């Protein structure tokens, strides 16, 4: 699929049919995550790739409100490494350091979701969760801070694209404008 087509046809998936994902596809998705741009090449992320069916099925309620994820074959818990976060905060100040680490994670998440879509899979980015319950449920290291959960799998039906605001409403030019019509 051409990149522009991928961008225009990717959508969040919240209904899956259980089909295992090939190991090489899982590796390709995770590899896309580590290729994301990041602050000063600190690579502040760490990913937990969860394929254990029981852990996935029991994640609803224990981690986040995701009842629709019971049939997903892969959950990726995206974490920020505390040691790197602390270094970013020391070097750039607390607010900027945290923002850099969160932006790093967001870039990795976006890369992984796009790669999953490129492989014909669907995915969803799940935000805030109970961090302590997430760490306990998935066995996450004490010095890793969960920041998002991705569900990845085969869509139960073609994903529904949602409307977007017109480009002209989402952009303000500073300088010579470009016709966005």
PLM-predicted stretches and their roles:
Residues 19-24:
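A short beta-loop-alpha structural element at the N-terminal edge
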Residues 67-75, 139-161:
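A glycine-rich helix N-cap at a beta->alpha junction
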Residues 9, 35-36:
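Helix-loop element at the rim of GNAT/NAT acetyltransferase active sites that forms part
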Residues 38-108:
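Glycine/small-residue-rich phosphate/adenosyl-binding loop
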Residues 33-34, 76, 94-137:
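Small-aliphatic-rich amphipathic alpha-helix that forms the alpha element of a beta-alpha
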């Amino acid at each position: 699929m051409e990149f522009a087509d991928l961008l225009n046809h990717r959508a969040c998936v919240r209904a899956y049919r259980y089909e295992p994902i090939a190991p090489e596809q899982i590796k390709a998705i995770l590899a896309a995550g580590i290729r994301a741009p990041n602050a000063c090449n600190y690579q502040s992320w760490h990913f937990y790739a969860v394929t254990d069916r029981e852990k996935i099925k029991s994640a609803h309620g224990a981690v986040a409100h995701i009842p629709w994820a019971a049939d997903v074959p892969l959950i990726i818990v995206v974490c920020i490494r505390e040691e790197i976060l602390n270094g970013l905060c020391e070097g750039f100040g607390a607010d900027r350091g945290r923002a850099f680490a969160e932006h790093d994670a967001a870039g990795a998440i976006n890369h992984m979701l796009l790669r999953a879509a490129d492989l014909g899979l669907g995915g969803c980015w799940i935000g805030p969760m109970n961090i302590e319950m997430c760490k306990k449920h998935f066995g996450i290291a004490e010095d890793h801070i969960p920041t998002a959960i991705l569900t990845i799998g085969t869509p139960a039906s073609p994903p529904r694209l949602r409307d977007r605001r017109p480009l002209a409403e989402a952009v303000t030019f500073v300088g010579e404008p470009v016709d966005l019509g």
